[in-house]
From Swiss-Prot:
Its EC number is 6.3.2.6. One of its GO terms (molecular function) is phosphoribosylaminoimidazolesuccinocarboxamide synthase activity. It comes from the Bacteria. The keyword Ligase applies. Pathway: Purine metabolism; IMP biosynthesis via de novo pathway; 5-amino-1-(5-phospho-D-ribosyl)imidazole-4-carboxamide from 5-amino-1-(5-phospho-D-ribosyl)imidazole-4-carboxylate: step 1/2. It comes from Nitrosococcus oceani (strain ATCC 19707 / BCRC 17464 / JCM 30415 / NCIMB 11848 / C-107). This is Phosphoribosylaminoimidazole-succinocarboxamide synthase.
């Protein structure tokens, strides 16, 4: 029996989440919206929602095949996916393989510097406070996750890094950095949210051309075209 979409649960920067007639499942609707700088810059790009929906499904299926448990279940339509309902941790896990963006601004390191080993950072999901950086002591003290869950998130994040660096490199792309979000269902930590060019940085391996949301952030144009190029290189069917 088909899952029935019911009322809106939450509307974020580029996705809307709906509850369904099954309390264990949600529907993610990937919109064409794009925002940057905490919502100060907003624009719509034709087909972006469809590309991100299919891109996310592609990556989630690759990760699941490699043994990473995720909330993704299946595509429902051009812009909708069915996912497991998780109790999300209010935390972003960020891995940086190449220095750029806020890391360079904070630490004064050279833009484009290869980072070995990669840098791992936690951020609190709080738009009003601009997603401040936190550490494991904050997480433990304020009860955002327990130590076992924190270790599981870190382990999965680094395993995902190993998997995706190879996947993208084979497509002629550098995985510069990315963010992940996790949640809990029945005591198990699962990868939630999404993995799309909205939440990672991807550069051409030879030219270091930006093929991600930085094209929107920095007014470079060609946002949809860049996302399509990444999908094409990965062999995705759009």
């Amino acid at each position: 029996m088909a899952t029935k979409k019911q009322s809106e649960l939450y509307s974020g920067k580029a996705k809307t989440v709906y509850i369904t007639d099954d309390p264990t499942q949600l529907i993610l609707y990937f919109r064409d919206d794009t925002s940057a700088f905490d919502g100060k810059k907003i624009e719509r790009f034709s087909r972006k929602g469809e590309i991100n929906n299919k891109f996310n499904a592609f990556i989630m299926e690759k990760l699941a095949a490699a043994g990473i448990p995720t909330h993704f279940e299946r595509l429902l339509s051009e812009q909708e996916s069915l996912v497991k309902r998780l109790e999300m941790f209010p935390i972003e896990c960020v891995v940086r393989n190449i220095a750029t963006g806020s890391l360079c601004r904070r630490l004064g390191v050279q833009d484009g510097l290869d980072l070995d080993p990669p840098v791992f950072e936690f951020f609190l999901k709080d738009d009003a406070r601009h997603d401040p950086m936190i550490n494991e002591y904050h997480i433990r003290t304020f009860g955002w996750a327990n130590p076992k869950q924190v270790e599981q998130m870190k382990e999965y994040t680094f395993r995902i890094n190993d998997i995706l660096k190879v996947l993208f490199l084979e497509a002629g792309l550098l995985l510069v950095d990315y963010k992940l979000e996790f949640g809990d269902v029945q005591g198990q930590v699962l990868l939630g949210d999404e993995f799309t060019p909205d939440g990672c940085r991807l550069w051409d391996v030879k030219t270091r051309e930006k093929l991600d949301k930085d094209r929107f952030r920095h007014g470079l144009g060609g946002v949809t075209e860049a996302y399509e190029e990444v999908a094409r290189r990965l062999g995705m069917s759009l």
